[in-house]
Amino acid sequence: MTVTRIGVGGTSTPYDVVVGNGILGELPALVGERAQRVAVIHPDTLEEKARPVCEILRTAGYDVFPLPVPDGEAAKDVSVAADLWARLGQAAFTRTDVIVGVGGGATTDLAGFVAATWLRGVRAILVPTTLLGMVDAAVGGKTGINTAEGKNLVGAFHPPAGVVCDLDTLPSLPREDYIGGLAEVIKAGFIADPVILDLVEADPEAATRPDGAHTRELIERAIAVKAEVVSADLRESGRREILNYGHTLGHAIERAENYTFRHGYAISIGMVFAAELARLDGRIDAALVARHRRILESVGLPVRYRADAWPALRDTIRVDKKTRGATLRFVVLDDVAAPAILAGPSDALLAQAYQAVSGVAPDAPDTD
């Protein structure tokens, strides 16, 4: 059993993201000797994946209680968080006890948020069971829940005590969810690691399979990109903003679809939008925009969204968490692995970029 440990620093308590097959046995060492109780937060649809986590921790001597929550984005609601706070209180959960989050990105976001807010902060260990969770949501310490006004508007920076990425959980993932996670892998390639793009382009079909020839390398490279960025900028005061490539429009699409649209699918469209913005601003050429479309489409990700949605999307973008005052900020590229911030783009520029994404712009690069 080969285990890879990717260190994440930038805090007084650095931690490892552990990657491998059949590695749930790493959990007791991460929980440690001081904890007596372990709360295992998991989607109510993933009891079979939470069960071995609970069994390993019980065997190690901990008082374990599972806390099922709704699946997906429905879990990231203040009512769900309040219910978990109540159950932690009923269990006399103390500051030395530990919360373990098992599931996809929405579940690990929620588990981290509850850990950050209970008793002003208890340790969290995250066990992502989706590709999206492994390469993005579980790494970096950003936690949050949604409101009616937008996604992740209430949250905290609360780095986990450890992240365990057991690759054995991926083969049972629905294909659409796995492909959605690839959007974040590809994003890491565009903002920091061109080798990721080369690997996907060399064999797109293999990239869509958990047992693909380069699957583990793609996952580890994407995690390493995020680990490096968040180690340098935990609280998103500077460099960490680049991780939001594609997310400004992507989050707006998710809200427009009432969070029923896969995160990765929305981010895929958002990256093409950001690339079109960069092209229109004179930063990149049409060939790089076309490369975005080609790579994303080659693994089954969408690159277009409906034309009539722009007014609602524009209004949502204005409350994006990256906005400074009244100034909109978009992560764009000056080149592959050369991210930058485009601040204050005009409404006309935004509309023109969106026309290209909706497929009706006369100057959109033809990649069909």
From Swiss-Prot:
<dbReference type="GO" id="GO:0008652">
    <property type="term" value="P:amino acid biosynthetic process"/>
</dbReference>
<dbReference type="GO" id="GO:0000166">
    <property type="term" value="F:nucleotide binding"/>
</dbReference>
<keyword id="KW-0028">Amino-acid biosynthesis</keyword>
<dbReference type="GO" id="GO:0003856">
    <property type="term" value="F:3-dehydroquinate synthase activity"/>
</dbReference>
<comment type="pathway">
    <text>Metabolic intermediate biosynthesis; chorismate biosynthesis; chorismate from D-erythrose 4-phosphate and phosphoenolpyruvate: step 2/7.</text>
</comment>
<feature type="binding site">
    <location>
        <position position="184"/>
    </location>
    <ligand>
        <name>Zn(2+)</name>
    </ligand>
</feature>
<keyword id="KW-0547">Nucleotide-binding</keyword>
<keyword id="KW-0456">Lyase</keyword>
<dbReference type="GO" id="GO:0005737">
    <property type="term" value="C:cytoplasm"/>
</dbReference>
<feature type="binding site">
    <location>
        <position position="247"/>
    </location>
    <ligand>
        <name>Zn(2+)</name>
    </ligand>
</feature>
<keyword id="KW-0170">Cobalt</keyword>
<keyword id="KW-0963">Cytoplasm</keyword>
<comment type="similarity">
    <text>Belongs to the sugar phosphate cyclases superfamily. Dehydroquinate synthase family.</text>
</comment>
<dbReference type="GO" id="GO:0046872">
    <property type="term" value="F:metal ion binding"/>
</dbReference>
<feature type="binding site">
    <location>
        <position position="263"/>
    </location>
    <ligand>
        <name>Zn(2+)</name>
    </ligand>
</feature>
<feature type="binding site">
    <location>
        <begin position="71"/>
        <end position="76"/>
    </location>
    <ligand>
        <name>NAD(+)</name>
    </ligand>
</feature>
<keyword id="KW-0520">NAD</keyword>
<protein>
    <recommendedName>
        <fullName>3-dehydroquinate synthase</fullName>
        <ecNumber>4.2.3.4</ecNumber>
    </recommendedName>
</protein>
<keyword id="KW-0479">Metal-binding</keyword>
<dbReference type="GO" id="GO:0009073">
    <property type="term" value="P:aromatic amino acid family biosynthetic process"/>
</dbReference>
<feature type="binding site">
    <location>
        <begin position="105"/>
        <end position="109"/>
    </location>
    <ligand>
        <name>NAD(+)</name>
    </ligand>
</feature>
<dbReference type="InterPro" id="IPR050071">
    <property type="entry name" value="Dehydroquinate_synthase"/>
</dbReference>
<dbReference type="Pfam" id="PF24621">
    <property type="entry name" value="DHQS_C"/>
</dbReference>
<feature type="binding site">
    <location>
        <begin position="129"/>
        <end position="130"/>
    </location>
    <ligand>
        <name>NAD(+)</name>
    </ligand>
</feature>
<dbReference type="Pfam" id="PF01761">
    <property type="entry name" value="DHQ_synthase"/>
</dbReference>
<dbReference type="InterPro" id="IPR030960">
    <property type="entry name" value="DHQS/DOIS_N"/>
</dbReference>
<dbReference type="GO" id="GO:0009423">
    <property type="term" value="P:chorismate biosynthetic process"/>
</dbReference>
<feature type="binding site">
    <location>
        <position position="142"/>
    </location>
    <ligand>
        <name>NAD(+)</name>
    </ligand>
</feature>
<feature type="binding site">
    <location>
        <position position="151"/>
    </location>
    <ligand>
        <name>NAD(+)</name>
    </ligand>
</feature>
<keyword id="KW-0862">Zinc</keyword>
<keyword id="KW-0057">Aromatic amino acid biosynthesis</keyword>
<dbReference type="InterPro" id="IPR030963">
    <property type="entry name" value="DHQ_synth_fam"/>
</dbReference>
<comment type="function">
    <text>Catalyzes the conversion of 3-deoxy-D-arabino-heptulosonate 7-phosphate (DAHP) to dehydroquinate (DHQ).</text>
</comment>
<dbReference type="InterPro" id="IPR016037">
    <property type="entry name" value="DHQ_synth_AroB"/>
</dbReference>
<dbReference type="InterPro" id="IPR056179">
    <property type="entry name" value="DHQS_C"/>
</dbReference>
